[in-house]
Amino acid sequence: MTTYTNADLHCHSVVSDGTLEPEALAARAKANGVELWALTDHDEVGGQQRAAAAARAQGMAYLTGAEISVTFAGTTVHIVGLGFDAQDERLLQGLARTRGGRGERAQEMAEQLAKVGIPGAYEGALHYVGNPELISRTHFARYLVEAGVCKDTSEVFRKFLIEGKPGFVPHRWASLGDAVRWIQDAGGVAVIAHPARYRLSANEEFALFSEFKQHGGQGVEVVTGSHSAAEAVSYAAMAQEFGFAASRGSDFHSPDESHTDLGMLPPLPGHLTPVWDLLAHRIQPAH
């Protein structure tokens, strides 16, 4: 079994809410020493063929990927699927249903922002959208920075785009069980993405991990761009407690916005099973 010292299994391209094309991401990953890579666009696999070809051209091994938005106990949680068949019909249908409604939500967001003195946000956000089916809060955030409303996208989210703020509009995503089933039925492994981001209570987090495991989930992101060193230690312990494999991914979106660049992450703790060990038969070789 091949050992990878630098795997990055979580990032986004212009196909969803990143700013780089899949080929540019692959080149950046290679330049940063990545050996095993996955493109994980939100609720979409349209960039997979390009990403796999770019990985081969750069001499990197590749796993298919997607980040699926789910609703759990009233909270939006992200599940990364890895190593699946990107042409699986049930997966494609499920992702299409999950993408549905984003346009209507975006119109509502723009209406709410107009009420607080920010007109034209929908049209502005569209300038940043690579895939019209995947217009998101991030695209609105980029426009509001361009318009001078806020200094950076983090400030936009804090002031306008999180729950309780004027531009937030909820959306009903897939269920946790649906997302895991789509991934597994397509031959992949489901992973809880950046669990510290959800700010769940200890009881809520235990419930999420328990239900995820009951549905057949097999992994958790232990090392990721938004986790502190202490959080990585905490989720390493939870991975052991639940018998999960550990994943590693930067969640890179843009050179101008992301705190962690592709591949520039601490290593996984050595006592954990890397998620790619579960997917050795699904890894597309570097050459």
Language model segments and positions:
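Residue-level detector of alpha-helical segments with a strong bias toward transmembrane helices
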Residues: 20, 127, 158, 259-261
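Extended substrate/RNA-proximal surfaces in nucleic-acid metabolism proteins
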Residues: 54-210, 271-287
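A general, composition-driven signal for non-globular sequence regions
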Residues: 4-6, 93-96, 240-242, 267-270
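Catalytic core of soluble alpha/beta enzymes
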Residues: 229, 250-287
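An N-terminally biased module of ancient metal coordination in phosphate/nucleic-acid-related enzymes
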Residues: 1-75, 161-162, 174-175, 180-182, ...
